[in-house]
């Protein structure tokens, strides 16, 4: 009877687990196919009038092409165009970049009317026939099936094109001067397939499915408690176990058991992570993810803002949804990076309090070894800091991997299946953070055999249906997360676009990920990142060698150690299936690296005492890792480099490369190991005396090496923040945000970038009473070789050459990328005739009517020289700290570190104008020139360089080089009237912030996207020239579906001079101002008609056009 009672007590939870599991599985499987409510958006034209005629409208579609387009123009309206023709109608303004290549254009000349979709003619009609009334209406259309046009009534004047010719729409533009009337219409159905919300039915199913899965897991937990055997597990603790055994007043005692070493390690690791949170460098994708999070509420979904034609980020979007919630509180970096830091803290506490105790329980085990605990902390931090201090998903993936491993171990240790079910949920949540989150599945795979044995062992009491149903239901729960608002059709379409646009790299080329780590002069192959990956690989393969050779390490549990090694190895294998191969994805292994570090240090402390040669080989390997790591630069992303030593070179000490020092030491220890190996045949023994000193020496090499790297990394960034203060750094911005209480008045880089809204306002005036020649005061008395038209026509700057592996770069993965990048208006050309007869197109908004130019271009027979008249300096004030000369060509200058850029001599000479009318020359100074040559740029002469008595200045130019490439041109000096970028732009003006800059300007508002239509920005904030050329201009390109798709089609740009406060040598980036090609009063923003329709989960509204 007791046995029957036990059977009955098992039957109920077993039945509940089976029924709830099957129900949860079926409900969750149905979620992707259930209907959703899709917001529809339509633009109708005409809208309003200008001077009694139909007005043009602006409506830049995020997807480029619409879902459907239908335009009808009465032929009598076409006949109203002038005799020489004009624009009948178009979907892009004619002056935009590649307008004809991308848009629909209906043009008329004196002979014909032509309808062209993307430079392909669809229909042609003779203009006299149109004017004579032979046709009634011109009809043009495009949809998922085809594109075409027809002059109704004219035989043969029609044509159809493939659907790939569907045009890009930025609005409706026309030269027609006709009133709105019957037959004149345009309809643009915007592609809003991703702006969806679950229907009531879908919400009910998701809620019921989630509840059913949770019920099944709870029922399985009840089965676990009733089915477990009498065996107990010694020294096992996990967060789940701790919570289940929580008793008030007892938890502190449990935590004290870990020992003093663990508490010291906890304090050191947590302090380092918190310090790094403030001073540490950010990741390459902080701006990317922050902008997506900020625009999501108005966009209606988590839109891929910088690429991929406005597709959704699903299935990898739940983390971005979390960031969007955080951004609604504050966009300050120190706030937005909290998830990453909390994930780091969580990872370490799991390692120190549970993973190590699982790997080596007991008094003599790994968890009780102080050096192993300290090594775990050092290796973990060394692996965490270079990768995981930003908004990328790797920090959460690292945490998810550890939690999954821990739950699997709990399931195995206690022979319980509920932790395994929870592990499945956690692993799949981790996998949907990003493609590299797939490594969390490795923990499931390595523990699957042991879990399967537990299922078989309990088959008699629990059966197979209940546990398998629960595990399958747990597996299906991820569908609720991924398809909570999207459908299977939209997610598949998003994936199709991403694979079509790229970049994607095949799985068998995963070696490129490791190659990127070796690329010099690249932050992704920096010293810190190289060390993190190399030391993890050393620990992984070192432990494999030790265990395969020796089979057992006393003090280390056999099963968990193999599953830890297997999780890492299988994780690296699964990483090959990610479509991108960025080196930053190694950050997902940070938690595993820390645990492997402890395991390796403990194992080597045991075997090192057995054989001197093995210990020496261990030290040799570590020295070689250091040598390889320090062959990279101490580089960090973008502003993370500010003030950091060796950010662009290999570390050096006393002019000697550090890498050579470590390589020499590794060679010496390698030779010593070889000598010890051959001596083994003659020595009586090779063991080291088992003393405390020798045990410490055998176990500490990895600890010492990892600590050196951690101290170097933290000291580098801290030094930059402290010694540069009050100049801009990430640390300064974070401290300011904290001090302000995350106030919106703390605006990071926008508070330190000085902008010159009107370059003409600061122009200096000549000192009265001077004489000068016909070229004006800028030419001085008798210029030789310098003339107003001495400026080259083509001032395109030298190319930027970057090496492979740069994140968010659409360049070749295996050869250098050569790209050009010039600020708007700086690449030369012809412009209006200037005040002294120059025809050069001036940059930075300089007014040619007030700005003379002198240059030596074309003077190839004698040395050119010119000394300008004296210009009056204004009284010195803190808000006007510079004298600036806009110049082009090759100019000699020195960088901050003393290296020079070759060119010809342009100097500024200070002087003193005395009351008696005389002028006394003072010192001459060379400019600060951030480049690039030969484009127009602003040479800087800090007024702090001027003698206190100086009140005038003049330009002294000398060009003795007769080479056609060695010339330069200049404009008069000015003292810019500046204001901060925050004062110029404010927090409400829409701005296009490039990926690299977006996280550094938290107060600026990224242009919004609403109902599939983009808001046109007024400004663009760019990073430094190299980053712009290698990343921004490629990743955000129109061909890839980035914002340039509509920005370059609808806007023109001009560069605003900017300077980073106090950091005059710094190329921080630039600011460009946008102007509409068709002004807003002529083509106002379109009114959009909004609606809602219900679509099924499998419904596909045709492919999004994603062709170049």
Curated annotation (Swiss-Prot):
One GO CC term on file: plasma membrane
Q: How does it sit in the membrane?
A: Multi-pass membrane protein
* Family matches, as Pfam families: Arabino_trans_C (PF14896), Arabino_trans_N (PF17689), Arabinose_trans (PF04602)
Q: Which Enzyme Commission numbers does its entry carry? A: 2.4.2.-
Q: GO MF terms on file?
A: arabinosyltransferase activity
Could you tell me where this protein is found in the cell? Answer: Cell membrane
Query: Which BP terms does GO give this entry?
Result: Actinobacterium-type cell wall biogenesis; cell wall organization; response to antibiotic
Segments spanning the bilayer are: 12-34, 204-223, 258-280, 334-356, 368-387, 397-414, 421-443, 463-482, 531-553, 582-604, 616-638, 653-675, 696-718
Keywords, alphabetical: Antibiotic resistance, Cell membrane, Cell wall biogenesis/degradation, Glycosyltransferase, Membrane, Transferase, Transmembrane, Transmembrane helix
Major location (coarse): membrane
Which cysteine pairs are joined by S-S bonds? none
Top-rank EC class of the record's enzyme: transferase
Q: Region Disordered: which residues?
A: 804-825
Q: What does this protein do?
A: Arabinosyl transferase responsible for the polymerization of arabinose into the arabinan of arabinogalactan.
Report the sequence similarity comment from the record: Belongs to the emb family.
Name listed for the protein in its UniProt record:
Probable arabinosyltransferase A
The record lists the organism as: Mycobacterium avium
Q: Print the organism lineage.
A: Bacteria, Bacillati, Actinomycetota, Actinomycetes, Mycobacteriales
């Amino acid at each position: 009877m007791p046995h029957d009672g036990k059977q009955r007590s098992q039957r109920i939870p077993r039945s509940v687990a089976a029924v709830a599991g099957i129900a949860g599985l079926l409900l969750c499987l149905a979620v992707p196919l259930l209907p959703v409510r899709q917001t529809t958006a339509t633009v109708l034209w005409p809208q309003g009038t200008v001077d009694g005629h139909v007005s043009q409208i602006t409506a830049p579609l995020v997807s480029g092409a619409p879902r459907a387009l239908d335009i009808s123009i009465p032929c009598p309206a076409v006949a109203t165009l002038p005799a020489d023709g004009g624009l009948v109608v178009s979907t892009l303004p004619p002056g935009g970049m590649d307008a004809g290549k991308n848009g629909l254009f209906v043009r008329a000349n004196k002979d014909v009317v032509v309808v062209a979709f993307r430079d392909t003619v669809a229909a042609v009609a003779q203009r006299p026939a149109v004017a004579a009334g032979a046709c009634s209406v011109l009809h043009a259309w495009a949809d998922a099936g085809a594109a075409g046009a027809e002059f109704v009534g004219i035989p043969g004047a029609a044509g159809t094109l493939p659907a790939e010719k569907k045009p890009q729409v930025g609005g409706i533009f026309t030269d027609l001067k006709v009133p709105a009337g019957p037959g004149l219409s345009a309809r643009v159905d915007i592609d809003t397939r991703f702006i969806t919300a679950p229907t009531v039915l879908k919400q009910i199913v998701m809620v019921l499915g989630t509840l059913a899965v949770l019920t099944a897991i709870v029922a399985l937990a009840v089965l676990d408690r009733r089915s477990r055997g009498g065996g107990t597990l010694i020294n096992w603790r996990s967060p789940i176990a701790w919570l289940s055994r929580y008793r008030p007043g007892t938890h502190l005692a449990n935590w004290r058991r870990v020992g003093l070493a663990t508490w010291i390690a906890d304090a050191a690791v947590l302090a380092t992570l918190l310090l790094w949170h403030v001073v540490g460098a950010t990741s390459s994708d902080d701006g990317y993810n922050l902008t997506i999070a900020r625009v999501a509420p108005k966009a209606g979904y988590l839109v891929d803002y910088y690429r991929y034609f406005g597709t959704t980020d699903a299935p990898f979007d739940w983390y971005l949804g979390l960031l969007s919630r955080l951004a609604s509180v504050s966009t300050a970096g120190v706030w937005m990076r909290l998830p990453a830091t909390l994930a780091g803290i969580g990872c370490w506490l799991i390692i120190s309090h549970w993973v190590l105790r699982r790997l080596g329980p007991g008094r003599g085990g790994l968890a009780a070894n102080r050096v192993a605990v300290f090594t775990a902390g050092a290796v973990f931090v060394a692996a965490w800091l270079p990768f995981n201090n930003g908004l990328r998903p790797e920090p959460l993936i690292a945490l998810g991997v550890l939690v999954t491993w821990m739950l699997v171990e709990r399931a195995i240790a206690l022979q319980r299946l509920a932790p395994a079910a929870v592990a499945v949920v956690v692993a799949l949540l981790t996998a949907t953070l990003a493609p590299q989150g797939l490594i969390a599945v490795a923990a499931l795979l390595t523990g699957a055999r042991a879990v399967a044995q537990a299922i078989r062992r309990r088959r008699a009491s629990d059966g197979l249906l209940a546990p398998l149903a629960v595990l399958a239901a747990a597996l299906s729960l991820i569908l609720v997360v991924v398809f909570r608002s999207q459908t299977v059709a939209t997610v598949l379409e998003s994936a199709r676009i991403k694979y079509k646009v790229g970049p994607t790299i095949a799985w068998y080329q995963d070696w490129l990920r490791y190659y990127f780590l070796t690329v010099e002069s690249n932050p992704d192959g920096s010293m810190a990142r190289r060390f993190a990956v190399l030391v993890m690989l050393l620990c992984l393969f070192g432990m494999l060698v030790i265990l395969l050779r020796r089979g057992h390490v006393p003090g280390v549990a056999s099963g968990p150690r193999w599953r830890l090694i297997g999780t890492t190895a299988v994780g690296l294998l699964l990483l090959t299936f990610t479509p991108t191969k960025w080196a930053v994805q190694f950050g997902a292994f940070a938690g595993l690296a820390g645990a492997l570090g402890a395991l390796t240090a403990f194992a080597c402390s045991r075997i090192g005492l057995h054989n001197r040669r093995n210990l020496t080989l261990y030290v040799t390997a570590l020295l070689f890792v250091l040598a390889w790591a320090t062959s990279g630069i101490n580089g960090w992303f973008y502003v993370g480099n500010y003030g950091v030593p060796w950010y662009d070179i290999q570390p050096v000490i006393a002019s000697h490369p550090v890498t050579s020092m470590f390589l020499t030491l590794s060679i010496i220890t390698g030779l010593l190991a070889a000598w010890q190996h051959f001596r083994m045949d003659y020595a009586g023994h090779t063991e080291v005396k088992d003393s405390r000193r020798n045990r410490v020496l055998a176990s500490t090499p990895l600890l010492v090496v990892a600590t050196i790297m951690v101290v170097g990394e933290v000291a580098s960034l801290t030094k930059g923040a402290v010694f540069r203060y009050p100049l801009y750094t990430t640390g300064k911005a974070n401290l300011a945000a904290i001090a302000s209480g995350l106030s919106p008045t703390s605006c990071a880089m926008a508070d330190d970038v000085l902008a010159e809204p009107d370059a003409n306002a600061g122009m200096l005036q000549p000192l009265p009473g001077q004489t000068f020649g016909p070229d004006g005061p800028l030419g001085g008395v008798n210029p030789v070789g310098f003339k107003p038209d001495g400026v080259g026509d083509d001032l395109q700057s030298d190319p930027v050459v970057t090496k492979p592996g740069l994140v968010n770069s659409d360049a070749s993965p295996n050869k250098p990328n050569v790209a050009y990048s010039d600020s708007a208006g700086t690449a030369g050309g012809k412009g209006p005739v200037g005040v002294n007869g120059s025809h050069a197109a001036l940059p930075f908004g300089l007014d040619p009517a007030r700005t003379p130019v002198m240059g030596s271009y074309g003077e190839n027979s004698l040395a050119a020289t010119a000394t300008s008249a004296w210009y009056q300096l204004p009284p010195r004030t803190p808000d006007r700290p510079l004298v600036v000369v806009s110049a082009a060509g090759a100019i000699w200058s020195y960088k901050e570190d003393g290296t020079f850029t070759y060119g010809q001599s342009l100097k500024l000479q200070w002087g003193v104008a005395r009351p008696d009318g005389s002028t006394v020359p003072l010192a001459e100074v060379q400019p600060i020139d951030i480049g690039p040559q030969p484009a127009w740029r602003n040479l800087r002469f800090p007024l702090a360089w001027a003698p206190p008595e100086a009140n005038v200045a003049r330009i002294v130019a000398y060009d003795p080089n007769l080479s056609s490439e060695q010339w330069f041109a200049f404009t008069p000096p000015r003292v810019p009237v500046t204001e901060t970028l925050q004062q110029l732009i404010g927090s409400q003006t829409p701005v296009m912030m490039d990926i690299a800059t977006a996280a550094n300007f938290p107060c600026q508002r990224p242009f919004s996207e609403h109902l599939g239509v983009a808001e046109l920005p007024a400004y663009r904030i760019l990073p430094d020239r190299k980053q712009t050329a290698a990343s921004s201009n490629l990743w955000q390109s129109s061909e890839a579906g980035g914002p340039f798709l509509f920005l370059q089609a609808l806007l023109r740009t001009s560069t605003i001079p900017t300077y980073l406060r106090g950091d005059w040598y710094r190329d921080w980036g630039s600011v460009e101002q946008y102007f509409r090609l068709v002004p807003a009063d002529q083509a106002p923003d379109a009114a959009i008609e909004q609606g809602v329709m219900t679509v099924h989960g499998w419904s596909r509204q045709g492919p999004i056009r994603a062709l170049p």
